[in-house]
Amino acid sequence: MRPDKTTTPKRSLPQVTLCAVDARCPALAAQALALSMAQVDFARVVLFTHGWVPAEPLVGIEVIDIGPVRSGVDYSHFVLRGLPRHIHTSHVLVTQWDGFVLDAAAWRDEFLAWDYIGAPWPEQPAATAVGNGGFSLRSQRLLKAGLDPGIEQEHPEDQMLCRHYRAWLEQQQGVRFAPLDVARAFAFENAAVATPTFGFHGPYHLPKALDEATLHAWLRELPNEFFRSRDARRLARALLAARMPATASELLRRRQQAGQREPHTRMLSAVAALMRPFFNAPPAVSP
């Protein structure tokens, strides 16, 4: 899953702005943006956040304070109603802390022919399966459509756009959603695919994209809310499958500390403890 970036030339996408919206773990969002920037030259890169000042300047990344983003509802409202005024390119690549460009060589110029592309959702009819907003390419047409008062329900914004209002967006706004085959080539979220994709979304895929020392350090930036989530448990399983038991143990410790002590979590903790003597722990990271 990890491309060889030493031999892969950077892709130039002057038509695309890269952005993330994050006030919970902006430091991780900034690192995810940097990982995408390592493979692609974008027209502009922006981190929308609130009340956060990076410890060191972020080279090539604009940081814009957008006021409080306290919930998923606030996130959806900004992406639909606030983001459009900040985007001046034909397209924007919307990402989150747990998704980034995976293989720039998998980019297809045909992606720009569509108004919305995101990783397909599983167990959905083809007509509403595209797709996830956590790593999604959106056109100006889509952004402007999101401002229409006809969109009354905003959250979750990707499901509202791609399921609830999709027919209306297609018929009244002329929005073109990418077909499944194009979306599968663009990104994945729920399950990894055998062929290369441009990007991905989902914390449970991180062990295949990052080394253990980096992942171990990333855990320190995540809020308790994450450790209580189903995604955290899926990440623990992925860490064990990737033979990263030390990082899995730390994640599960934080999960139990956050109040999640169900049998499955305790079982995963026991498995991690059994595996640790057989695999090297990650290097220590300075506070």
Model-assigned labels for residue ranges:
Residues 1-34:
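N-proximal low-complexity "stem/linker" segments adjacent to membrane-targeting elements
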Residues 34-43:
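Short, acidic, metal-binding catalytic loop of nucleotide-sugar glycosyltransferases
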Residues 45, 97-98, 139:
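Generic structural signal for small/hydrophobic residues in well-ordered secondary structure
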Residues 48-90:
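Active-site-proximal specificity loops/subdomain of glycosyltransferases
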Residues 89-100:
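Short beta-strand-to-loop acidic/aromatic patch adjacent to the donor-nucleotide binding site
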Residues 100-129:
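Conserved donor-nucleotide/metal-binding helix-loop-beta segment in metal-dependent transferases, i.e.
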Residues 130-247:
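Catalytic core and acceptor-binding pocket of nucleotide-sugar-dependent glycosyltransferases
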Residues 273-287:
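Alpha-helical linker/edge segments of TPR/alpha-solenoid repeat scaffolds
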